[in-house]
Amino acid sequence: DLGGDGFTALLLNRYQSGSVGRLVTVDDDGEEIASLDVAEEVRDVSACGRYLSVLYADRLVVYNRQLQAYATLHGPEHTREVLTRADGSVLMIGADSAELFLP
């Protein structure tokens, strides 16, 4: 899910493949709240409540709707998907297990 409370997250990329893109949050009227240039692979994005989680190849970053980093976890190597919860915690889902990240 890419929708949080009063915002939606968008991951924009100019090319079909590649890792250069832009992470954008927009409000319910479609107006931009914040944006962040992304120069690396994004594996998954999830939003809920006031938080947005982005899984990069080497770390998990939890942002607020203004795309300010709230928490970072380095090295979740086996995580394939993330599920952000309303309290800012993130369920990190792997092929055969899941862990809860509590910032």
Regions found by a protein language model. Name each.
Residues D1-D5, D37-R50, P76-S89:
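Repeated scaffold domains used in trafficking and secretory/extracellular systems
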Residues G4-F7, E31, R50, A95:
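Intrinsically disordered, low-complexity regions
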Residues E81-P103:
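Hydrophobic, glycine-enriched assembly/anchoring segments
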Residues S17-V38, D58-P76, S97-P103:
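Surface-exposed loop/turn elements that mediate protein-protein interactions on large endomembrane-trafficking
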Residues L10-L12, V54, M92:
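Residue position within the beta-strands of beta-propeller blades
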Residues V45, L52-L55, V62-Y63:
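Structural recognition of beta-strand segments within beta-rich domains
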Residues D1-Y15:
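Extracytoplasmic beta-rich ectodomain segments of secreted or membrane-anchored proteins
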Residues S19, C48-G49, Y56-D58, A86-D87, ...:
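Short loop/turn segments that connect beta-strands within the blades of beta-propeller domains
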